[in-house]
Structures are given as C-alpha cells and as structure tokens.
Regions:
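Catalytic Walker B motif of ABC-type/P-loop ATPase nucleotide-binding domains
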Residues: 14-17, 256-259
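H-loop/switch region of ABC-family ATPase nucleotide-binding domains
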Residues: 49-50
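Conserved ABC ATPase "signature" region
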Residues: 212-227
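Helix-to-loop junction immediately C-terminal to a conserved catalytic motif
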Residues: 157
Length: 289
C-alpha cells in the first residue's frame, strides 16, 4: 500500500527501509515483482535490507554499510560472485533461500493443549486439539501472513479474552491468569514492551531474584554490553530486538514466546540469537517461535 501511494504521488525516487521484514515468502515474491515494475518505469529505488535474496534479480549496485560508514560498493555482477562464506563474514544473509528439513511433532509432553479455539469471523476460526509439547524443546509456528500465528501465541499466553482453552502443565489445568504469570513474550514490535529509561533497569523490571552477572553475560553475548546505560528507545531497530530477547532471557518463566525474533537482524546477530535460544532451552523451558 505504501509503495502504491509513493508511485501514485509521482515520485522519481523511492526509499525503503527493510520492506520485507514482516512479510512471508509469497508476499516477498509480490514485493520483488513490484520493485521490478517500478524499475522498468524509470523509478530509482533505494532499499536498506538484511534479507537480500529477493533483490538479486533487481539490484544494480550494492553499498555495504558498516558502523555508519560506507565500507564497499559492488556492481551487481561483483556481488553475485560472493559465496556464502564471504557473505556471512560480512554479516550478510545468503543470496538464496535454504530448505529446512524439520521432524514432525512427536506425541507426549508436559504442556498439553486439550482444546483451543478463537473466532476471527463467523467463517474463520483458529482451532487446536490434543497437542503436547516437551520441556527443553523449541517449537516453530509457521504460516502465511494473517493466518493466526501471533493470535495463537496470544491465546497460549492468556492475552486473548475471547479465546477458549483447556491447557494443562504437568497434569494441572492452567487458567489465563496462571499462563500469563508464567509466560514471557518478545513481540513483533518491541517498542510496545520497553518501559524504563535505562537498558539495565529494563532487564530488572518484574524479575524476582535478579541475577546481575547473568544479565551482563547475556548482554555481552548479544553485543549489547556497551549500551548498558543507554535509554532503550535510543537503540536501533535490530538492537531493540536483541535487547527484548535479552530481557526475556533474564526471566524465569517456563513458557517463552518469540514473535518474529529475527526481524531487523543481520546474519551474525541471527547466529548469536540462535545459539542463545538453543542454550536457553535446556533451562526447563518450552520455547515457541
């Protein structure tokens, strides 16, 4: 819609800041086609992106920015010659999508959804029955834009008042209030969950028996230790995302939910987050992404 509005306004230059960050694969394909059409119409397009695969057939020049400075300029042919290792060394994501082989969900586990339902409209309904999840495991929730992934997380946490659930943990039925008390969430828009005036104070917020040393280690692992006295809202988008993840990891909640946690991140920080989440799952947690 924003791209269409810019085109209708008759502008000759369109600047986009991570336009694919919240899009699924199908929508990204549509975005790529739109950019190609705009380019053919003589419109100059500047795209700031971490996700680069969909731009490979469109881009003419690539500018690599590092710490606020122009590090290198590539022609399209020069950039296409970079292999995966060279891209990753520059903290860039791959030029091609990888296909993942993920095992099917096995039966059994301490966290049981006997029944869950949520009505979007008279015709559309989110419904789950008889699914179990184990402690110490990470579960991926996938689907196209607008299919109910975020709504499902909100239902599991206990944030959706209109939802109906029968959810058990270790044999005991959990009310919405109990699930909310025992859950931690990283939202899609982390600006909605940053409240204090200093990074370290944000980590302390709502945490009983706060472990200061553990918090400092987590910040260091995520490359955020130098911002410990900064205001959270002064961080960049990717830094805020990592910081929200650090905040969740300082809590003791057994149920942890990540809603699009890699949004706005480059390759190296995605690897850091992946390693930290894998380490975190061993601490008697059930993690939903």
């Amino acid at each position: 819609l924003c791209i269409a509005a810019s085109y209708i306004a008759g502008t000759k230059i369109i600047v986009m800041d991570e336009p694919s960050s919240n899009l699924d694969i199908k929508s990204i394909s549509v975005l790529a086609k739109m950019l190609k059409i705009l380019k053919e119409k003589g419109i100059s397009i500047i795209v700031a992106e971490h996700r680069i695969y969909y731009l490979m057939d469109i881009v003419d020049r690539v500018f690599l920015i590092d710490k606020g400075k122009l590090k290198k300029t590539y022609t399209r042919s020069e950039f296409l010659k970079l292999d995966k290792n060279e891209l990753n060394a520059l903290s860039l994501r791959d030029k091609e999508l990888s296909k993942l082989k993920v095992p099917y969900l096995k039966e059994g586990g301490e966290y049981q959804i006997k029944n869950l339902s949520y009505k979007f409209t008279d015709d559309e309904c989110l419904s789950l029955k008889d699914i179990s999840f184990k402690l110490g495991k990470i579960y991926g929730i996938i689907g196209s834009n607008g299919r109910g992934k975020s709504t499902l997380l909100r239902c599991l946490i206990g944030l959706e008042k209109k939802s109906k659930e029968e959810i058990y943990f270790k044999g005991e039925k959990l009310s919405k209030k109990e699930r909310l008390k025992n859950s931690s969430l990283v939202m899609q828009d982390v600006n909605h969950q940053l409240f204090t005036d200093e990074v370290f104070n944000e980590l302390r917020l709502g945490v009983k028996n706060f472990d200061e040393e553990k918090a400092k280690i987590i910040l260091k692992d995520l490359g955020l230790d130098e911002f410990i006295e900064r205001h959270p809202m002064s961080l960049s988008g990717g830094q805020k995302q990592r910081f929200a993840i650090a905040s969740v990891m300082c809590k003791t909640s057994p149920f942890v939910f990540f809603d699009e946690p890699s949004s706005g991140m480059d390759y190296s920080n995605m690897i850091k987050i992946s390693e930290l989440i894998n380490k975190y799952k061993t601490m008697d947690k059930i993690i939903f992404i």
